[in-house]
């Protein structure tokens, strides 16, 4: 699995998938953040996160960190987009430029089938735009895009991920639905 973005959603997602036994590569462009994470330090407080990171970075080696997705898509089946979507001050709407940038990078680097999952907090219709950005550069047979919004609460995010009270998956076909299950 590849997780793009190591903020709150991305890091919780990556650490919890590692806890389930998946090999996870977390990607972020912030070199200082990557160095902190590689040393096993979490950049925010979440109960249990330091222990999960230590376990899966240093012991099981299921979590690794990279600064680009370029070299990671050959060995991944699912890419989670978990980048920030800050609110624009004047328009009171989400700034999706980081999501679009990741979609472009994915399109430039996919060589085999991948499921692209938007997990960031995004408005309705974002997944369709991500699909269009990627399909403008590569054959639609090489990917599907799914929406899988997060419902994590600060202070209980690990438990919320491992034992969710609901899971939402937005997809247009059985193949991607089955992968997500």
Predicted segments with their positions:
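Conserved beta-strand segments of alpha/beta enzyme cores
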Residues: 23, 62-64, 144
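Rossmann-like NAD(P)(H) cofactor-binding subdomain of soluble oxidoreductases
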Residues: 87-151
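NAD(P)+-binding Rossmann beta1-loop-alpha1 motif at the extreme N-terminus of oxidoreductases
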Residues: 1-42
């Amino acid at each position: 699995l590849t997780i793009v973005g190591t903020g709150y959603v991305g890091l919780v997602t990556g650490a919890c998938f590692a806890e389930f036994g998946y090999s996870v590569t977390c990607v972020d462009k912030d070199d200082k953040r990557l160095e902190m994470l590689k040393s096993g330090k979490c950049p925010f407080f979440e109960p249990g996160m330091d222990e999960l990171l230590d376990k899966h970075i240093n012991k099981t080696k299921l979590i690794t960190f990279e600064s680009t997705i370029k070299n990671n898509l050959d060995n991944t089946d699912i890419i989670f987009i978990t980048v920030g979507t800050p609110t624009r001050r004047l328009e009171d709407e989400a700034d999706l430029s980081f999501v679009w940038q990741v979609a472009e990078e994915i399109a430039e680097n996919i060589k085999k089938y991948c499921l692209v999952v938007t997990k960031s907090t995004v408005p309705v219709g974002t997944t369709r735009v991500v699909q269009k950005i990627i399909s403008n550069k590569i054959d639609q047979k090489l990917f599907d895009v799914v929406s899988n919004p997060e419902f994590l609460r600060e202070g209980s995010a690990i438990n919320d991920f491992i034992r969710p009270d609901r899971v939402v998956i937005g997809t247009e076909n059985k193949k991607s639905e089955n992968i997500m299950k």
